[in-house]
């Protein structure tokens, strides 16, 4: 299943809780979650986790080289590394570094290392998730440190690499929902609406209300440049 699913809703609606349940970080107090018809708690835990790549809001980078931060001990496929680095929008930054992929991500232990910005670290975490050969990709606000235009461009590129993978995205910026096959709208810890972008806009419900409110915000704050893309 290579369905691309976006999860949206107001703060506290249950979006991240839903993802934590999928990853077995929480156990359901009611009902069950099935994967291929099998309760997810019946899978061996480590085997289950190998099916997932994830990027959370509290992503981490380490005082290792750029290459090691992306591959994290996995076999190095140079072409694939270059591909995910470019898709994440980190290629120009790495090419500008004296040691390229060998540059240490921090000056904590190496004065020749490089300090990355929050947005650059987030891109590295995204590249790491894309590098892992997993069947399911989960991204919880993966682009929060990026501006709306950079996020829009990144999603457009990223989805190309996710062919053949089931993908879940949580985002407060609703324009990226246009790239997804399905949007789940959470409210009060339940799924209130379910459908593609066009269907939900025609429904004129909660999703349409949030989308239009956000588009109006961008029109005011970005002089129409972002809103033009979104509409």
Q: Where are the predicted features?
A:
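Conserved catalytic loops of ABC-family nucleotide-binding domains
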Residues: 160-169, 177
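Helix N-cap at the start of a conserved alpha-helix in ABC-type nucleotide-binding domains
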Residues: 148-150
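ABC-fold ATPase nucleotide-binding domain signature/coupling loops
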Residues: 34, 91-124, 133-135, 189, ...
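C-terminal portion of ABC ATPase nucleotide-binding domains
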Residues: 100, 156, 178-231
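Helix-to-loop junction immediately C-terminal to a conserved catalytic motif
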Residues: 23
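ABC ATPase nucleotide-binding domain helical subdomain, centered on the C-loop/LSGGQ "ABC signature"
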Residues: 34, 49, 67-111, 155, ...
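Catalytic Walker B motif of ABC-type/P-loop ATPase nucleotide-binding domains
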Residues: 137-141
